[in-house]
Amino acid sequence: MVVGQAKAAMGKISSAIGERSKRISGAMNEPLRKRKILLVIVCIAMLLDNMLYMVIVPIVPNYLETIRTYKLVYITIPSNGTNGSLLNSTQRAVLERNPNANEDIQIGVLFASKAILQLLSNPFTGTFIDRVGYDIPLLIGLTIMFFSTITFAFGESYAILFAARSLQGLGSAFADTSGIAMIADKYTEESERTQALGIALAFISFGSLVAPPFGGVLYQFAGKWVPFLVLSFVCLLDGILLLMVVTPFASRTRGNTLQGTPIHKLMIDPYIAVVAGALTTCNIPLAFLEPTISNWMKKTMNASEWQMGITWLPAFFPHILGVYITVKLAAKYPNYQWLYGAFGLVIIGVSSCTIPACRNFEELIIPLCALCFGIALVDTALLPTLAFLVDIRYVSVYGSVYAIADISYSVAYALGPIMAGQIVHDLGFVQLNLGMGLVNILYAPALLFLRNVCQMKPSLSERNILLEDGPKGLYDTIIMEERKAAKEPHGTSSGNHSVHAVLSDQEGYSE
């Protein structure tokens, strides 16, 4: 009797759990909700990548100091004779620390190794993403980042830390590119796409700015391995959430996928090249200031350790403000994305030129905030433009075009840690900032080249002119199918079937 009641109760509990699981699964797979969950997953991946990129800033220099190798040196100890003469001597072995003359170079190479490998990997990862979709590369990227973070936590030599840093670059090439491309694919309406990419940029900024104090505090009070284990745990949870939402390894036929445009063809597109150049140019000041501004603050304004530690933290709020303003302007005036980017480049240039004139910490905060505000304008305006260019000129597959965007960022962050210190040593901090500011201001007029492209967004007549050469993007393909259907005797049914076939191809590709 009791056993039967227990079995019945267990059956009811199991049934309730199964029913609840089905409801949760059904809710997560509802299209609009699933799109929002995927945006959260991508934003967490961006946050983790940039936190891992910046969390080592307060940790690595001090840690390398503690593990700096010793070398065995033999010193001669003379012995005096009875009359004061040196009759014999003895040798004693002592441990002597290796000089740290090349420590700055080692740290610079370690910081740059992530961006260098990311730069080298992106041409291949972009093509891979175009072929298999966005979910598998995102999962691969999260997996690589997880193992990279674990390696950072327990690595105890420069070689292991270098390998972990380089491994992170490979993971970023998969996760960053596929994540941004997934957002562009899921959010097809221009204002929604700009808003979603702006949210992702906000997470990138937050990760970069909060990571140094996060890493420094945990490193000081809990040890080197704690901040990396925290990040690896969040990375693991993000990967599990991704597996709950999508089925990356479900069977898919090759015929149901759209073939993306080769990356080399996108690279020589003049419009995409202008956007990529702007993304590189606007990030050069940030990439070159991060490794040099602390020493300059110490020498120029006798800044304290806490001031150098929170140098970039106030800039987070203007960056968010820049994202918000650009999203609102793009929704109301979508034809002027190029103008928002050009204005951002000018702000970056002026801010970079005024940084050397600052003589205290309070003054320095103003140009740094303006610098990050300008970067937000450029990134938020131009990243959606890349997806739009692919939509109207090629096939609506975004892996390769956002691999080009990732390459643009990686160029700046690969050169910064290696070249910035040498430029300051040879030319000076003032000359470095004036040069970076001048480059940004001079590049701003190049975005005029995008003016006509942006004006095509609401112009159906110009899109129809493009369609005379045949369909290129997904939406143009649908329009062409509808035109053909209208000319056929039984156009309605065949036209609907063709349009549904195109849409199902895209859904089969991105799911």
UniProtKB/Swiss-Prot annotation:
Protein location: Membrane
**Where, by residue number, does the polypeptide cross the bilayer?**
37-57, 109-129, 136-156, 166-186, 198-218, 226-246, 268-288, 307-327, 338-358, 364-384, 401-421, 429-449
- Fetch the InterPro entries from UniProt: MFS, MFS_dom, MFS_trans_sf, MFS_Vesicular_Transporter
A Gene Ontology BP annotation from the UniProt entry: chemical synaptic transmission
User: What SUPFAM superfamilies does the record tag this protein with?
Assistant: MFS general substrate transporter (SSF103473)
Q: Which GO terms describe its molecular function?
A: acetylcholine transmembrane transporter activity
Provide the family line: Belongs to the major facilitator superfamily. Vesicular transporter family.
Q: What biological function has been recorded for the protein in this entry?
A: Involved in acetylcholine transport into synaptic vesicles.
What's the protein called, per UniProt?
A: Vesicular acetylcholine transporter
Q: Which organism is it from?
A: Torpedo torpedo (Common torpedo)
